[in-house]
Amino acid sequence: MNGRADFREPNAEVPRPIPHIGPDYIPTEEERRVFAECNDESFWFRSVPLAATSMLITQGLISKGILSSHPKYGSIPKLIFACIMGYFAGKLSYVKTCQEKFKKLENSPLGEALRSGQARRSSPPGHYYQKSKYDSNVSGQSSFVTSPAADNIEMLPHYEPIPFSSSMNESAPTGITDHIVQGPDPNLEESPKRKNITYEELRNKNRESYEVSLTQKTDPSVRPMHERVPKKEVKVNKYGDTWDE
């Protein structure tokens, strides 16, 4: 294999180019015959009935007073206008039928142009269908055709992009922080020990200390030694000196 594959289907139809129909186009004999036929049929089968119907409706509206007549010419201007509108409406309504007549002509450039234009307008469904078949053929054939470059690409490791933060440092990833891992806080370890003393224990402790201080005040035997030892009487001379007897 040369690395290239022909994805064109063997039974695929090659679209023919649309013939250019310009102002200098000379119609064929068949096309002239169809033109004359369309002109006659559109006149007798569409224009005349619509023109006559429009004139009758207009005359009826004038006679009922819905439409006013001309003071000098009466209803003639409105009837002529209704006839002209019916004539052109009949011609326009026959255009689609005349196009179908040209499409049925085999060796007609004008008919081929009309058929190609209709195929172009209705091409999206077929276009997507052919495109899906083309994609399936590409995927089916590319599975058998491999190149060294494709093998090297498959052997390369796949890396996932790391998201970067939009903070002060743009080059730092969002998952990385600058803080240092610290050890356990000693205050956190001591806090549970302090919380072991309950309110009841503290209350009992305060009550015991209060009772001890109260007994020391009331019981003379518990008083300190310097309070129980009586003071010695000393004599003082006129100069303020003391002596024992």
Swiss-Prot record:
Q: Which organism is it from?
A: Pongo abelii (Sumatran orangutan)
Q: Which UniProt keywords apply?
A: Endosome, Phosphoprotein
Q: Which GO terms fall under biological process for this protein?
A: regulation of stem cell differentiation
Where is region (Disordered) located?
111-142, 164-245
Query: Could you tell me what this protein is called?
Result: OCIA domain-containing protein 1
Q: Tell me, what's a Pfam family for it?
A: OCIA
Composition-biased stretches (Polar residues) = 164-174
User: Where does this protein have compositionally biased stretches of type Basic and acidic residues?
Assistant: 190-210, 224-238
Question: What's the entry's take on its domains?
Answer: The OCIA domain is necessary and sufficient for endosomal localization.
List of residues that carry Phosphoserine: 108, 116, 123, 191
